[in-house]
Amino acid sequence: MSTGVLQFVKGIDFSGNDFSGDRFPHDVEQMTQMTWLKLNDSKLEQVPDELSRCANLEHLQMAHNQLISVHGELSDLPRLRSVIVRDNNLKTAGIPTDIFRMKDLTIIDLSRNQLREVPTNLEYAKGSIVLNLSYNNIETIPNSVCANLIDLLFLDLSNNKLDMLPPQIRRLSMLQSLKLSNNPLNHFQLKQLPSMTSLSVLHMSNTNRTLDNIPPTLDDMHNLRDVDFSENNLPIVPEALFKLRNLRKLNLSGNKIEKLNMTEGEWENLETLNMSHNQLTVLPDCVVKLTRLTKLYAANNQLTFEGIPSGIGKLIQLTVLHLSYNKLELVPEGISRCVKLQKLKLDHNRLITLPEGIHLLPDLKVLDLHENENLVMPPKPNDARKKLAFYNIDFSLEHQRKIAGQMTSPSSSISSVHSGGARQDALARRKEFIRRRKQQADQQSADKVIQGMSKIAGVGAALTEKQQEEEERQLEAKSAVNWKKNIEKNRRHIDYSDIFDEDVGSDEGMWVWEIENFYPSIMDEAFHGQFYDADAYLVLKTTREASGQLRHAIFYWLGEHASLDKGMCSAVHAVGLRNHLNATCRTQREEMNDETEEFLTLFGEEIVYIEGGRTISGFYTTEKPAHLTRLYRAGVNGTAVEMEPVPLSVESLDPRFCFLLDAGETIWIWSGYKSRITVSNKARLFAERLNKRDRKGKSEIETCRQARCPPEFWQALTGNPDKPQGAIVEHVPEGFVAERKKLYKVNIGMGFLELPQVELPKGIAKQDMLGSKGVFVLDSNSDIFLWIGKKANRLLKMAGQKLVVELHQMIDRPDYAQVYRETEGEESMMFRSKFAGWDEIVPVDYTRTSDSVQRVPDLKVIVKKDNMMRADLAALFLERQPSMSYEESEELMEDCNYDLELMESFVLEGKKFVKLPQKEFGIFYTMDCYVFLCRYAVMPEEDEEGEDEHDEDDKPEMDFKCVVYFWQGRDASNMGWLNFTFQLQPNFEEIFKDKLEVVRMYQQQENHKFLSHFKRKFLIKRGRRGLTKNLGGKWPELFQMRANGSSVCNRTIQVDCQANQLCSAFCHMLRIPFKEIEEDGHRGVVYVWMGKDSDPREHEFARQVASDLVVRDDDNDFRIVEVQEGEENEEFWKVLGGKKKYETDSSFVKHTRLFRCTNEKGYFAISEKTVDFCQDDLDDDDIMILDNGDAVFLWIGARSSDIEAKLSYQAAQVYHASMRMKANEKPRKFMLAVRGRESCRFRKCFHAWSKMKEPMG
């Protein structure tokens, strides 16, 4: 149904819609008064026929479409002023020739098409002021075009195949902009340019310009403001350019200029200078005189530190500075004085450091420094350091060192930057001066305000006192008057003749009125005494006294369920009736079921109550519309949740997505089995906000997975509780993108309406695009919203309501598309979700302690005391745990074995523990569990005072204790521990009673006392003991012997039999069984490979381990061969798969450190693992920081939280910065280690690295 508003539409922007095929709205032909129309990016294949009926159309845009021809319809538009059809598929034959004869045609844009020649009859468009033929394949320009179009102001012929221009171009004396870039123009000498005295823009990039074909008379063109001679291989800057006084923008990039020979006083008005991709080594000093310069591009040159003027800080208007791809090692200090600098690019240089003031630039948004390998950033000052606070934790290096008890020395760079007192810089002093001046000014103004208010208050108090005295005198002078006389005196003379008849109350009788639509309505006497409980009534009883005077009694009766307006109007009209009758009686209120005796006697004490109401209310009654169940497909775009409406059917479901089913009382979140859990969680949060804002918390939110959907879900979706028979299949196309949103603004004028679009950068709408005085329409194709501002006038609101109805009907939409009305301040959640960042969630600081939340008296004290969350990073600043010397290790081993009396070994076979043969003592398997029973002597306590009183025969007896060590291999299951606790441990407890201690240990996490009992002969093999003994030993095996921090921790562990597992810092054993027994009876060989950097004192133990443990009990006929690194034979490398690159740098052994970052204590804390760490110390619940001396790695566990990851990243940066400050430490790189894909630089720090264990669940 048409609203009749289309005939008043003056212009509309349909850009971004899909008008392919026959989808163009036919209602456009009703817009007979339309003067402008935009159809950009609308997938048009031909000019719509409806345009031929828009005879008043003046401006038409059809850019970015698929037009092949514009014949027919354009010729029917006699008033056409501008034709913009760029970026189509037009050819010369597809352009009608008669449109150029239109007298009013002024703008012609045919760029980015397939034109090979200038359209026919173009020379007849004599009124044209804009002609754009760029990005075509035009080879020549007819002479007649330049001869006739003498009124042109803008001419763009760039990106064609022009070799020359007609000489008649000199007739374009009014031309202001000429763009000829990317044309050969071999035969165009620019001799005609001086005749174009109005020319202000000249673009001739990549047009084969040389010093010969640039005329010196170019300096006569005083109006030139924008010149582009880039990509022309010019050796120097043309001399004529230096004389252009009004030049604002100059582009000379892509040439071969080696020197910029400018002098002082030239280019004083220049704002943009582009000298990129040249061969400059120096920027002239007079560049700093260009005080209006805002953008300077000098990338891809040969600039050094000496080539940048030291006074560059004088360019106070500079906002963009590009110095990428040069040879800069330093940059002048003056750059930090360019206070308006917003973008600074210094990438791909040789920078060592930057000026300290770089952190003080207030407007700097982009600082590109990548590909500067040796760059060391200066420390941040105090003001900038505050921005390092993350989750209320200050991660600045100085603050963390201070907490750790290591204050920076006065000579350090940090101390010099943050020192106060006399060493404050000029900026800090200026800030302090401004603060004092402002405080002083505020104090003076405050004193003046207080004085003025005091005077006003004094005068006011005096006046008030006089008025009170005057009123008291008047009251004393007044005599007591009757209240009836007061009523008569103050009675308002209001005419009630239109409400009450003249004969009302003129004689004895009773009148009853019912309140209907704010006014009393007289009732017939037959209905007297019948009252509806939802109505209100007015009753008048008039009697004649003996004196002949009339006496009136006025009542107003209120039903129990009467509406507010009826009760109010009955009271008001009762007073009006009394004034109408000039009565002196009171109006008496009567309520249902509480009537007075006087009122009941009027009806013979018989009153009938009737349920309901007989009259209508004067108020508008609102009827809540029935809820429309809708289905939305949820998607995540960054942090925003996008809800795309889909048809309400099972066929809309897709197992890869999450869906929100809004059924009114219940909101369902349905998740497909292939959907992402993050999308489901965000959809749930969206439903929570939808319920809170739109439903006031009255809806229930339910979630269900595809595999288990309750009948209630299917009932809400299909109307049937049974699960549909058909399968839910993937049907949404890959890479599906929802249709672009369009935001219209409704404009109204004298007799016309306009509907332009608001430009959405990158298709993103923001809340600040809406204005309180305006009316906007948001069109997302499947939904259309009308938003009305609070201050919008009534006519604009009405126009918006009618236009949104027409817009909904005109454009082809799905059947489930709906129109919604939104009011400013009361927007629905679905409307808000269409705008980026529109979320009114109350910000909550979850890092605040409960005490600080409960305390409210002094907010400043709370903020000052609790603004920093507790964090413990002290471990990062401690020195690395020193390695134990060989002598100390020997002494520790001796002490640990001193009290050992007995050691029995057991191994789990099947479900029982059996005694381990003595020849296998010290050999472990990764899939087995072992039990060691150790008996220790306990020395008796000596009596210090009564030592001499004991006789020699009375020596105290030696006591003992038993420690049971349970050792579990890395690949063993927990069943071994369960068997031990239920079988063997009870027997030990029964025997040893309270003298028993059980210690459970895991592979490579043994304590020193346990390791000391094996005296460095500790071998760990892969696999299971029984299986390996029977079937193993027939293939080569490689073992690595390694001691971390102490020789007590010496372990020999089997690794992959590959050459890249070798390391020059350790000894290795390579066991090679022969296929056939040699003549000398040897069945194999064991190579003991000595790394060049290995400890010579460990070589003897390597030989013992090889002969006692690596050689099997039945392989005594294996010969042992000692090999020094670099002296290997061919057999050695052949068994290892050929000679390959292995780790030869042993320095990492002295630097390896492993830190654990966790929140398990209730706050963020970092602790350091012992030097003897292993792969299983990498906890999937936490974040780890590993330092190998060359790089600092951040390793993220599979189950760690996002907060832990963010805090650990900041802490790792603090550690990285602290190591850089140490004089004896070499610089380290900051790298990320991805779990399961760790690099060899990371893995080499762990003894016998193997496959990562997958976390449970």
Curated annotation (Swiss-Prot):
Sequence ranges of the Gelsolin-like repeats: 523-600, 640-714, 759-832, 1168-1243
| Keyword Kinase part of the UniProt annotation | no
Q: Mention one GO biological process in which this protein takes part, according to its record.
A: barbed-end actin filament capping
Q: Repeats (LRR): which ranges?
A: 6-31, 32-54, 56-77, 78-102, 103-126, 128-148, 149-172, 174-195, 197-221, 222-244, 246-267, 268-290, 292-315, 316-338, 339-361, 363-384
InterPro entries in the record: ADF-H/Gelsolin-like_dom_sf, Gelsolin-like_dom, Leu-rich_rpt, Leu-rich_rpt_4, Leu-rich_rpt_typical-subtyp, LRR_dom_sf, Villin/Gelsolin
- UniProt key word Ion transport: no
What exactly does this protein do?
May play a key role in embryonic cellularization by interacting with both the cytoskeleton and other cellular components.
Q: Which family does it belong to?
A: Belongs to the villin/gelsolin family.
The name of this protein is Protein flightless-1 homolog
Gene designation: fli-1
